[in-house]
């Protein structure tokens, strides 16, 4: 009995230590992480290699404590370990926990192989605010090639946005395919987009200007209250979304216009269904609303692109890929940031015209599309160059005459 009690006492700190190990994930967040990453949404930070040994050491302590607990129980006499006895139950429990924590230790050692240049390892926050360890490949081409392309004689790939330039074959290289393996066909749009889509760009504050969110909210308010057509605003961060939503809410409430704002982690489906009900509603979306949602006809008639969709450079995967490009003598902006922003831009624009009878307007609130040297690349992704206007009021006036 005394030995069993000692085993019980040995197991208690093991459980407490397990909780500490979970909390120790917090220490993997590097010192000096910018506060802007933390308020809400996708809170990401690259793993600090200096904290790895401490975390693995804590797991090792836990395993050794379990091993000591097992030795304590196994030292009991045979009667205490007979079938159905408390001693045997305690032994089985300790053995099970030891096996699970050995698996955890092995998984941690695999995920924390920071010398592996083909992956990005980082910690983020889950929905409950707890720390979560992640490991993502920098490139998926090899995985796709092994899992799909080498197993089939022929594979047909189709995409409306994958090839933003004339070099269609080059677009498949990130998928693990070589140019000489690909027969590429580029087909024109089945829709007369030049007639179906109006494109305007507002020459206002740039996204990094202090007054950008205020100007964006005011502009969306003008478009929504003037046109009274379902309006989707695509943003690139929840922080900006929240700021714009707070400024828009009183304006739209006074006009009787429904406002839907996507929350971090919120699925697009329920918001999309509510938005489709019409009524000239305004939907503020990010992430999942740039692709994969379908709003034909009057379900979406005005699309506002808040800013050109460049990825956040501090995103762990983006940062790791940028580091690799620099090491290989490339330019992260030219070789990564710009191509991926163009792809996301085309995906966002694709939310508007879904059938041959749709008609709608794209309003781009980021003046860099007209001012910057790379703006021409984004303009080429549109069916026609955008007309540059001085204000949202001018845009609304033009669109009032353009819509039937």
Residue ranges and their predicted role:
Residues 1-404:
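ASCE RecA-like P-loop NTPase motor cores
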């Amino acid at each position: 009995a005394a030995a069993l009690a000692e085993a019980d006492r040995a197991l208690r700190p093991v459980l407490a230590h397990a909780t500490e190990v979970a909390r120790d994930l917090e220490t993997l967040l590097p010192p000096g992480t910018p506060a802007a990453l933390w308020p809400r949404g996708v809170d990401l930070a690259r793993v600090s290699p200096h904290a790895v040994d401490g975390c693995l050491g804590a797991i090792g302590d836990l395993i050794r404590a379990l091993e000591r607990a097992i030795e304590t129980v196994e030292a009991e006499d045979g009667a205490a370990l007979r079938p159905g006895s408390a001693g045997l139950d305690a032994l089985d429990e300790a053995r099970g926990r030891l096996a699970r924590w050995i698996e955890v230790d092995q998984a941690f050692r695999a995920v924390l192989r920071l010398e592996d240049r083909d992956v990005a390892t980082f910690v983020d926050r889950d929905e409950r605010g707890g720390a979560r360890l992640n490991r993502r490949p920098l490139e998926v081409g090899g995985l796709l090639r092994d899992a799909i392309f080498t197993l089939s004689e022929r594979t047909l790939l189709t995409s409306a946005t994958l090839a933003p330039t004339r070099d269609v074959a080059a677009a498949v290289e990130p998928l693990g395919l070589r140019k000489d393996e690909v027969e590429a066909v580029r087909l024109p749009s089945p829709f007369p987009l030049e007639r179906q889509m109006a494109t305007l760009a507002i020459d206002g504050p740039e996204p990094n200007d202090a007054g950008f969110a205020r100007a964006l909210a005011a502009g969306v308010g003008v478009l929504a209250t003037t046109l009274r057509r379902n309006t989707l605003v695509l943003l690139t961060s929840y922080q900006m979304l929240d700021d714009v939503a707070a400024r828009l809410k009183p304006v739209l409430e006074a006009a009787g216009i429904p406002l839907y704002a996507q929350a971090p982690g919120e699925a697009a489906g329920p918001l999309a269904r509510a938005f489709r009900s019409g009524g000239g509603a305004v939907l503020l979306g990010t992430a999942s609303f740039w692709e994969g949602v379908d709003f034909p006809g009057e379900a979406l008639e005005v699309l506002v692109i808040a800013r050109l969709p460049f990825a956040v450079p501090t995103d762990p995967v983006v940062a790791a890929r940028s580091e690799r490009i620099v090491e290989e003598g490339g330019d992260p902006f030219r070789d990564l940031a710009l191509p991926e922003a163009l792809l996301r831009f085309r995906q966002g624009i694709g939310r508007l015209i879904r059938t041959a009878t749709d008609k709608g307007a794209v309003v781009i609130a980021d003046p860099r599309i007209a001012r910057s040297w790379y703006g021409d690349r984004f303009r080429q992704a549109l069916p026609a160059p955008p007309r540059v206007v001085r204000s949202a009021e001018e845009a609304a006036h033009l669109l009032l005459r353009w819509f039937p």
